[in-house]
Swiss-Prot record:
One of its GO terms (biological process) is carboxylic acid transport. Forms an efflux pump with AaeA. Could function as a metabolic relief valve, allowing to eliminate certain compounds when they accumulate to high levels in the cell. The lineage of its organism: Bacteria, Pseudomonadati, Pseudomonadota, Gammaproteobacteria, Enterobacterales. This is p-hydroxybenzoic acid efflux pump subunit AaeB. GO terms for cellular component: plasma membrane. Belongs to the aromatic acid exporter ArAE (TC 2.A.85) family. Coiled coil: none annotated. The chain crosses the membrane at residues 22-42, 52-72, 76-96, 102-122, 129-149, 161-181, 378-398, 415-435, 439-459, 467-487, 491-511. It is a multi-pass membrane protein.
Amino acid sequence: MKTPSLTGPVFFTTPKFARLRFAFKLSFAIVLSLFLGFHLQLETPRWSVLTAAIVAAGPAFAAGGEPFSGAIRHRGMLRVVGTFIGCIGALIIIIATVRAPVVMLMLCCIWAGLCTWVSSLVKVENAYVFGLAGYTTLIIIVSTQGTPLLTPQFAVERCSEIVLGIVCAILADLLFSPRSIKQDVDRSMGELLVDQYRLLQLSMSGAEKETIDAAWHALVRKTTALSGMRSSLMLESSRWQNSNRRLTSLHTQSLTMITQACETYLVLQDAPTPVKSSLKLVLDQPVESFRDVHCRVKALRHLIAADSRDVPPTLVSWVGAATRYLLLAKGVQTNGRITTIEADVLNSEVEIKAPSAETHHAMINGLRTGVATALGCLFWLSTGWTSGSVCMVMIAVVTSLAMRLPNPQMMAKDFLFGTIYALPLGALMFMFIMPSTQQSMLLLCLSLGAMAFFLGLEVQKRRLGSLGALASTINILVLDNPMTFHISQFLDSAIGQIIGCFLALMVILLIRDNTKAHTGRTLLNRFVYGAVSALTTNTTRRKENHLPALYQQLFLLLNRFPDDIAKYRLALWLIIMHQRLRTLDIPQNAALSAFHRQIRATAEQVILARRDTTRSRYFTQLLGELERYQQMLTEQQLPASVTAPVGRLTGILRDYQHALSN
């Protein structure tokens, strides 16, 4: 078998070339920021070099490879915003407490904890802004402890150096032709639809419960991943606006198909009914591609249109959602203008955003950052160590950035190992290589670029300590103007980094996050609220699309409780009940409308209750109200198709009352 040559067209499309391209991109960004920093006579070009390295390498470490187009630009813009917020916060704190340095440092620790708390509540994409704002304030205040009157000048210099580093990272990203995510979006849409059809086949054939669980579990993750790709596509270019709108609705259609397929399975399990031979003939045919599914959905649509008797309503709904999916997927592939039919689909529902269910988790994160920085501050003040400020800054950086991740301990370990690796690597650069390049700017750039190139390759492999080593090595190198080489200062800074990361890891380990059970219960009660909120006669409320918010909470549940299949099933049943109750033909009636509002208010009290006894009391009240509501529907002489789903929901809540209320 012939291997592709380095000059052949095949090599330029391989993952190996993408890794090499990113390593060159990272080296170019660092070298350019270093050269411009010295050329523009900046006081500390190290900050521009460090910024370029973090902005370029951070998304690559998160992605496990070269980031998609737009990711580095987005990261850079977030860093600009976070830096300005941090500078403003530092100026306000210094002006208010300039005569009380200890109070100033304590306020700075509280500010860092507050920013971490906010970053844990906002979207993951925007959390970087607030984490950065917290430790930027700390850096400025710590760096100007001896000369507070120079704070405005220092803040302006830091902002200038950071903006220069961001500009260099963005220029490098543009010059080295970042890869577009569009092809991955098109491929993922096709694979997702094929998997959706296979889940329907499993549901109609009465497969094992474990097989169904594994299938819909994987589909939820793939649908969430496609939604994340949509965000990356918008970062790439504004020309994808129409595709973005289609992908938003396509996300809803995918979730609808998962729900309808699982409901079909439950319906057939409760009341097994033979499937029409014509439908069975189509459903039994295997599918391998997007085109195969298109043909099967078209055949199912024709069969249902010809004779819809004995066809499960959930199957009809699934085919309708699949038809809309196919329509939108074609529009995404072409990125053409939105047609009238597509506009009707896009405007048919109003998506509802879900509030954060991790408020207690966010408080723990803020407490960790505040306590860790306060301990670092006390350590610095009590010892008088010259590099105590470096230790304190590293504590703030690690705790601020690690808290938003699913595994903060692993992030802290990455920084700790990185600072340990940075000691010998930095010593090699500082003691031998950099002093030999003092007469040549070219040699200095080449040496730093070579180091960045090899570390860039390791960062893409998500090697433990690689990202921390890159940032820590640059941080302890004296890239100032003019450059000085003091061994004691270098060792103090290197050891200060290690101690700071170690203290941050100890705080994360000692202040345990015991909010997991609370978050899980809150999420499950949000599903209960989502189910009962579907009971309404208000046409505006009926158009509200809660499905993306409910599945977003389900995805969070999957991440927080990766092995608790019982929680997943309960959550999925409640989502199915939401969809079923949403389609009920409830007549306009003032008494029923008032009861709907009362049920929603009680369900909200279940979520807000802080004590188990209070929550249990409101939950019992909710069950009583649902039973009374079912009686009211019966008194209205409504058919069983309306009253039975309410009874089914009441039965589910009664069976799981202990898990939902205690």
